[in-house]
Amino acid sequence: MIQLTILFIGILTTFSACKKDDKTIPTVISTGNDPNFTIVANSDTGFSNFNRKVVVFGIDIYAVATVEDAKLLHAVNIMAQYLDNDEDGTVDNQLVLNKMLENKAFLVMWKNESDLNIEPPSDRLGQDLGNDETHPSFVTNGNTGPFDASLEEVLHIINNAGHSFAYPNAFGQNIGSDLANAMDIARGGQFMTIPSQYPANAWYTYYDQTCDYASCQTIEYLYWALTSMLGAQENRLNEIDNEWRLNTRQKVEDTDTAIFSILTNPIYKMPTVLPDGSYKQ
């Protein structure tokens, strides 16, 4: 993931209401071959770099012309599977989706960094995902090979625009939320700035100086915990242990009891199956 110029800060952006641009990109758009979703031409205000989009339960996923259709549709299916994890055609947690819709949540898919030189409306919350970091075969190959960043970036926007607003006491990106309290334990203390060295007993040790306590560290922590519980990190310990050490469900359950309790609370209806990009197929 990279940061959108000016407006993208850390892993999220605050972006305002949608109307159509006068200028559209005169490109023939393939509708794709997905049985559940259709690629359509895009002309939404603030997204003129992106020639097409797919709408998933009301959430816009935009792509520039150089993003592969297969990768766009893969991200779409990942979004659908996170939101409707049992794939019965109805989102599992309507409150979370409602908050995403209120925040006009979106995902933008890019090929080159310059694609992110955009100015989305100011009341929209967004996240970016790169074409070349999207690897549809990761899960179907037994969670091996190049990691599929759609598992991270799609989850970020759901957590940021959805869970944080639907359940502020539990998932609020602020000191004192259940999520932040659990994170403080995982980091070995409450660090408002990145320490030069985390305590030896910490298992979440993110050293990115651009990642602040609230809007970034909390969301990254939530991603690591949930995807580890879903199995995405089981073969990646050597790649990720400089940042996260509990790469399996059992390790999270045994060591990070606070976050495990939150994520298994049936009230929140968190995903229990790792998306593989094959929604209702």
Identify the residue ranges that each predicted region occupies.
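Conserved aromatic-histidine-acidic binding/catalytic patches
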Residues: 63-70, 142-146, 207-219, 243-251
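Pan-zinc metallopeptidase signature
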Residues: 215, 222-281
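Bacterial N-terminal signal peptides
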Residues: 3-14
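Acidic/His-rich structured neighborhood in mature extracellular/periplasmic domains
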Residues: 56-196
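Bacterial Sec-dependent N-terminal signal peptides
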Residues: 13-37, 281
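Generic detector of solvent-exposed, compositionally biased contiguous segments
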Residues: 33-35, 41-42, 46-49, 78, ...
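Post-HExxH zinc-binding segment in Zn-dependent metallohydrolases
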Residues: 162-238
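Start-of-domain marker
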Residues: 33-63, 67-71
